[in-house]
Every structure is written in structure tokens, then in C-alpha cells.
Amino acid sequence: MAGRAKPRHRRLWLPLLVFAGTIGLLLYGVVALLSEDPLWFLGRTALPEPLRIVIRVDGEETLLTSFSPGYDVLFEATEKALSSFESLAPRSAGLSEETLAEYEQSGVILEMYFDAPVDFHLPFDDGRPTALLIPIQGRHAGQGYVFRGKGGRWWAGQLVMSNPQPLLDALTMLGYLQD
């Protein structure tokens, strides 16, 4: 009996599989290099414990540190709210000097300051911010915006939370918002 011939189509799978794997690794590598984060695909925010949380309600500022009542509640609620985002690209709006001055006098905003950078694990370079500003009431409020900053400067290109409700619920429970 003559030797069995292998069907030719089976030999095509291996080069196609190697080619597809190479393309996949190349795409992963490009995104990892551009985002400066090899775990960009996780899509979960690594939120370090804040040094301080500042809540500003109509110009009145409340400073919370790790031993303050309500600190843990706000931190956990912020972790939940920042667990997913509506889009994977930052929006183009930023915080003008006028908006920041308005936040000093009216509305409700939440600011968090960290000693370690926040890592959003996104497929672009998130800048590794050490401060977050979340408008709750007033300009830019009600849209789930999260502004990032570092070194006393706020950056253009806010992220949009998918569900800010845990944060709103915590602020209401602590008396910073009215139902």
C-alpha cells in the first residue's frame, strides 16, 4: 500500500494560525507601548487610597482624611463609580479658569488627591494623574465627568463614568446632597 498523503488544507492552518497570533501580539504590543500599561486590557481603575478628599458645596469646603467620618464610604463609592467608563477615549472639554472660579463659589464638586498615580488601565496613556475632580452639581455636572490632574493643574480630556450613582448615593447619605 502506498504512503498515505495528508490533505493539503490541514497544512494551511498552521501558517494562518501563526500569522494571526503574530498580528494579535503586534497589536497588543503597540497599544501597551502607547498606553504605557501592559495591563490596559483589564479596563479596571486601580485607585490608590486618597491622601485627602475635598467636598465643596456652594463654596463651603470640607476636607476628609483617612480618619474622618465618611471617608471610607466616599472612597468605596468612588471605586465603584470609576469601575467602568462609557467610552475609551477622553472627551475634549477641559476646566477653564472661569469654571474653576465658579466651582469655588457654587455647585457641588468632589476632589481626590493621591500620593500615588491613579491607573485607569485604558488603551491610551492616561497620564497617571494624582488628582481627580468630579462635578456633582453645577457646570459639567450630571454627565459623569471625571477630570484628571497632577501638580496643581487640571487636564483637558475628561473621562465619563458609566454609572456615577454609587457616588451620588454616598454623598446624599452623608448629607452633602439633598434628595
Could you tell me what each predicted segment is?
Residues 2-179:
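Function-determining sites in protein domains
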